[in-house]
From Swiss-Prot:
Keywords: ATP-binding, Cytoplasm, Glutamine amidotransferase, Hydrolase, Ligase, Nucleotide-binding, Purine biosynthesis. Part of the phosphoribosylformylglycinamidine synthase complex involved in the purines biosynthetic pathway. Catalyzes the ATP-dependent conversion of formylglycinamide ribonucleotide (FGAR) and glutamine to yield formylglycinamidine ribonucleotide (FGAM) and glutamate. The FGAM synthase complex is composed of three subunits. PurQ produces an ammonia molecule by converting glutamine to glutamate. PurL transfers the ammonia molecule to FGAR to form FGAM in an ATP-dependent manner. The keyword Iron-sulfur does not apply. SUPFAM superfamilies: Class I glutamine amidotransferase-like (SSF52317). It catalyses: N(2)-formyl-N(1)-(5-phospho-beta-D-ribosyl)glycinamide + L-glutamine + ATP + H2O = 2-formamido-N(1)-(5-O-phospho-beta-D-ribosyl)acetamidine + L-glutamate + ADP + phosphate + H(+); L-glutamine + H2O = L-glutamate + NH4(+). The keyword Nucleotide-binding applies. The gene is purQ. This is Phosphoribosylformylglycinamidine synthase subunit PurQ. One of its GO terms (molecular function) is glutaminase activity. It comes from Rhodopseudomonas palustris (strain HaA2).
Length: 233
């Protein structure tokens, strides 16, 4: 799997992401600078990692979404390429128009940094095939603006089309206000594009791929991508 990890000023999770990709796929990821206008030849997966691109000025992800490299990412996605955006990466994908909606301040206006539980809503996506449908996984979050919001019609369409892949839940998989850590509409933690090839999610699966972290639940996302690309080749 040939991966490209984007690097913007203020991003700070690119090396975590590159390490996770290397551990699971066995291949080094290419680091692509925000001013580049092309992606490496043969790229299978583009990852927009977490952090605080451009200091979160204007809006989280707003400046990064207008960086030169994002034109190449939009072209890559329109051609069916796989794109993963995590945390600030999710915000950038929304600001870029690759995903609908926006990430707002957490409902309690506090930064959240801890492990959370997610329910995998379906496993017929490249981004979830490493899990079972309905499986509960534990992954970390670290965000102050992870409250996914969209108009009512958009949320209904996302749910009706099966584009909500991950939701915040209890350890037993229950969905409800008490388990919705940031107030996100419909407890949404991750959504995909209409074609299903672009995923944005707030939690950080890249930080739960090694035993030393005490949990490897994030590994399934990357393993599923590797398997998908093998079968698609």
């Amino acid at each position: 799997m040939k991966s490209a990890v984007l690097v913007f000023p203020g991003i700070n999770r690119e090396r975590d992401m590159a390490r996770a990709l290397k551990l699971v796929s066995g291949h080094d990821a290419a680091m692509v600078w925000h001013a580049d206008t092309e992606l490496p030849n043969g790229t299978d997966l583009v990852v927009v990692p977490g952090g605080f691109s451009y200091g979160d000025y204007l809006r989280c992800g707003a400046i990064a979404a207008r960086a030169p490299v994002m034109d190449a990412v939009r072209k890559f996605a329109s051609d069916g390429g796989l794109v993963l955006g995590v945390c600030n990466g999710f915000q950038i994908l929304c600001e870029s128009g690759l995903l609908p909606g926006v990430l707002m301040r957490n409902a309690r206006l506090k930064f959240i940094c801890r492990d959370v539980h997610l329910r995998v809503e379906r496993n017929d996506s490249p981004f979830t095939r490493g899990y079972a449908a309905g499986q509960v996984i534990k992954v970390p979050v670290a965000h102050g603006e992870g409250n996914y919001e969209a108009d009512e019609e958009t949320v209904k369409r996302l749910e009706g089309d099966g584009r909500v892949l991950y939701r915040y839940c209890s350890p037993e998989g229950e969905i409800g206000e008490s388990h919705n850590i940031n107030g996100a509409a419909a407890s949404i933690a991750g959504i995909v594009s209409e074609r299903g090839n672009v995923l944005g999610m707030m939690p950080h699966p890249e930080n739960h791929v090694e035993d030393i972290m005490g949990c490897t639940d994030g590994r399934g996302l990357f393993a599923g991508l590797v398997e998908h690309l093998k079968t698609a080749a």
